[in-house]
Amino acid sequence: MPQAPMPEFSSSVKLKYVKLGYQYLVNHFLSFLLIPIMAIVAVELLRMGPEEILNVWNSLQFDLVQVLCSSFFVIFISTVYFMSKPRTIYLVDYSCYKPPVTCRVPFATFMEHSRLILKDKPKSVEFQMRILERSGLGEETCLPPAIHYIPPTPTMDAARSEAQMVIFEAMDDLFKKTGLKPKDVDILIVNCSLFSPTPSLSAMVINKYKLRSNIKSFNLSGMGCSAGLISVDLARDLLQVHPNSNAIIVSTEIITPNYYQGNERAMLLPNCLFRMGAAAIHMSNRRSDRWRAKYKLSHLVRTHRGADDKSFYCVYEQEDKEGHVGINLSKDLMAIAGEALKANITTIGPLVLPASEQLLFLTSLIGRKIFNPKWKPYIPDFKLAFEHFCIHAGGRAVIDELQKNLQLSGEHVEASRMTLHRFGNTSSSSLWYELSYIESKGRMRRGDRVWQIAFGSGFKCNSAVWKCNRTIKTPKDGPWSDCIDRYPVFIPEVVKL
């Protein structure tokens, strides 16, 4: 199914998104204003010396009213500053689920199952083969046990078993890494788009680990592949108002109940791309975690295009003519993703780009709007703002188009391509497999900036910016531990099956 290419980033940027980005800066204007003033005063006091300061003090004449007014003013300004200053949000550590080898689905196995399940639909089998050949996936991606049966057995029990397997293993590893005890978890957020049982997945986690009765728990569903960053945004907001707290985020997609067994081509695409995976993330606002945390959250920008009908329906769960439920992916998906991306990065640009890049971009944008629409648009160099890029591994076409539009090198998108090859599209958890890849390659240094970009149904585009808090040693375990030496690998345009 041919898809419209993603439009060039700066061909139709709207000024309202630029304005939105600068509104973020204005909201923190007081902090930006007071910090240099305080620094100048401190430097001047250090320059004067104690005797000169004492002489100045003695030369001043104060009365009680002046002292009270001055004290009140200082206290008022200090209070306003510290109340308006947001808490620092840390990413202490995270863990990614590593599927067992028994769940692997080589191309030959996938196609054999497709031929048996769709034995009366040879054209649908051929279509899946063409998609798989060009998907960018490798031979080691995994599907849950229920999908290995012929025919598949997508029962509620099987779906719960998959959820328990991926979520509990990721959380067990996270607790082991961080030393965090279940009783110390204050906030729990679980996001899974297509599987929403009763009791919820968050309740399942609470029951398993016997978490506190006053825990603040949330279960997000139906929010697509970008739900992981929505969970980060929710955790950030909660940590801003609840001091000295620990938050756990679980991002996953349960494949078992969502494996499409019908014949509609647009609904067969997810079968070829989506694979099992999960990630558990520990976030905190405790000052005691500042020394051991891996990252600090700098910015998070969310863009929702749901008001537009095409955007709303481009990723849509529905029944086909035979009653089989599946996800319909529109041929306009790439174009819609491009529009969401433009809005998102135009908003985040003023927050992260150097002043020189902002000036060039704004000059180009205003010139095109006022003087000549045919002027060649200036594409900001986001490589000056970030050292690492984690682009949602939704498919080969998504990565190709973002690399082209953002003018990124092969190394910048390496983590995304290799994650797609090794694990497939693991939905909302893919960003964390990509971050783990960068760490496993030993590339993460203190001060490095990471840009995570995710797309999701609705249609949404979300961005998170992290700053590395300390140089990260190459991990000895994790999802890449047994294969990182083989990567990066060459991925041909077409793999003949």
From Swiss-Prot:
In epidermal cells of aerial tissues and in the tapetum of anthers near maturity. Expressed in siliques, flowers and leaves. Belongs to the thiolase-like superfamily. Chalcone/stilbene synthases family. It is found in: Endoplasmic reticulum membrane. GO terms for cellular component: endoplasmic reticulum; endoplasmic reticulum membrane; mitochondrion. One of its GO terms (biological process) is response to light stimulus. The keyword Endoplasmic reticulum applies. The keyword Transmembrane applies. It comes from the Eukaryota. Residues 81-370 form the FAE domain. This is 3-ketoacyl-CoA synthase 6. Its main location: endoplasmic reticulum. The gene is CUT1. It comes from Arabidopsis thaliana. One of its GO terms (molecular function) is fatty acid elongase activity.
